[in-house]
Amino acid sequence: RVLIVDDEKMIRMGMKNAIDWKKLEVDDVFTAASGNEALKILKEEGPEIMVTDIQMTEMTGLELIKAARESVPELRVIVLTGFDN
């Protein structure tokens, strides 16, 4: 089970649809547009892996990782970023 977190819908849906999750033996892929939405999904659905952007408006990816690890210490995290500087 994987959770994709990004405040840009095109990125979220692109990752969800472009990756062959079944080939990777992933049964469920959840998406969240914000850190708060991601924390709710983590508690309700229990994904093992979270892919998150760093630059988000409501809560940064680093803040999300810290909060997520407090409730799910064994969570594996993949961090993405796309800024130029």
Listing of model-derived features with the role each one plays in the protein:
Residues 6, 53:
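Active-site residues of response regulator receiver
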